[in-house]
């Protein structure tokens, strides 16, 4: 029993350290509960989708962090100033998501399906950053 406890103590300490480092790496503006997102409607194949608009750096950093759910007919659209290879990750998310990158003309340049959230200390330490295959200005 003592050897098992001795083996688990360093693992527990490492998990706590990873969790603290992960939380410290979240920019302060994303931790604020009062981040407000403008809302809008976009059309995907003639189907309306209500979206929260992440069009500033603090809004993009915060994204859907700490949100418990997202109704099927809603989403968040990340809007960037110019085309680029904008990567996203699922830090402090509570549910998996599909991600779609669009170019300036609205053409799909990349899709990632069922991306898992990173919410435990071990998941946060190895949270994957998804990079699109093409330049985009919008990510849904």
Residue ranges and their predicted role:
Residues 2, 6, 22-140:
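Compact, glycine-rich, soluble single-domain proteins
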Residues 10-23:
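Hydrophobic membrane-insertion alpha-helices, especially the h-region
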